[in-house]
């Protein structure tokens, strides 16, 4: 179909005069796919609507938080009820402990938890805590894994920086970047070599248990357990970054899925019900090093703010009470969608592979199975951009970058899947 974008175009032009690039996060500018970004004004269930009235089946879902769909009534009601009592106090509220209890019950690795306002804050704080606990300075991360935009973690970070075609970010001092050891994902030997070379100097290993920021890339068999074994042996802290996967791939996150018990966990997205919130938590002996109990400082004016706590609690309570229905259905719908689009690509002669874990997935425009950053980098990003534009024209909203994961929600229906597959067939025909 032909979409009118007159109003979106006007709004984008106005924003560009006031905001760098007209956006508050680079991927929203559509630089990776071309075309004009629609300006969204409303979401309902599995759909979003732009300023010109165009509707789209949404597989971005605010980059993962909206597992129950847009404007989910119990979450909206919880936010409204909390807002009537006050939007922020800069002091503790009962709902903080309620949400903390819900998370601790869901994830056995978390004995204590601290709420913050973004995933970047969570991973940055977890890194600082690991360094403070161990007295060591080096950290290990993996190529193509994105853990937010703190300086230490913007090294071979996949996702946004990969989309921009740069290895990291200007403004990160070399002296700081040199303390971050970026290793290939799914490669245990590389981790062993790093710990041999930097014996007794590595504070932590931080890993996305299922990568979402070079597209969806699951761990190889026993990879996560190997990381756990190595860090335990070497006295380092294992940080599992579940900002994206927590409560998404299972109610207990990737930890439940893979039987993992890390030292620290970072969370975000779903635990805020669509509002800005994140957290880090883990072993009591480590968490008790945080001020005011210990010497590792972290604070925030809006940390644990009542609106986000209420939204997150409503979200987690619904997921907990309906987990036996929600997660199997999401898995089945996602498998159906991913496989049928793969079939359509094969019939059209388009090279396409896919990875999926639960309701988190990516179609890769390559004939290679993607297991790490090197294989992800073989994707035809230009062809993905053409596909993305054709899908938008057909009313399907996909992540505007090849190296981002897509998601389903409980609001998606079988008809949504049928319509998306039909749109993909038409898109493949014109590539």
Curated annotation (Swiss-Prot):
Cofactor(s) in the UniProt record: pyridoxal 5'-phosphate
Source organism: Koribacter versatilis (strain Ellin345)
Pathway: Porphyrin-containing compound metabolism; protoporphyrin-IX biosynthesis; 5-aminolevulinate from L-glutamyl-tRNA(Glu): step 2/2
Name of the protein described by the UniProt record: Glutamate-1-semialdehyde 2,1-aminomutase
UniProt subunit comment: Homodimer.
Subcellular location: Cytoplasm
Keywords associated with the record: Cytoplasm, Isomerase, Porphyrin biosynthesis, Pyridoxal phosphate
Keyword Cytoplasm: yes
